[in-house]
């Protein structure tokens, strides 16, 4: 039988529980995961992708409040430091789920007012995608394997064949408020929170994995 050489190498799980920061250090764990993802350019191209984690942190008054740490604009997963994440007060962000529409400018301005510290990096237009997904950890990347699969003419059928009902297919829509709502809705429709979400972007696609 003729052997077949895969066009895309499989992606190894590099998480090392001994090397990873303790679970109670949420930001350090997020940075560790981000570096692992960014180290493989077949998973996250330079400057592409973003990661987030939800938990609690102290605000400027010293109160513990629900927050989401998310990669800020202009940083790279492989080389970023903890200072490149932005902390957002979730109790101020989540009410946006009820809005019907929001421009990019309105969204960026609103999120700036939700930051724990105004000196933190500016949020990307994909920040609400992370906030609206009901999972504590969200890793959003552009892996080569998903690009090849979802970017074909028959991409939707192939994605469903590979991932079954655990995958949500969202036809191309420009990143921003509407896409964030659609992704959040896809996760709310009875799917397991560890699913892979596929978003087709013409010749580009994105995979969002949650846990």
Where on the chain are the PLM-derived regions?
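Glycine-rich flexible loops
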Residues: 1-211
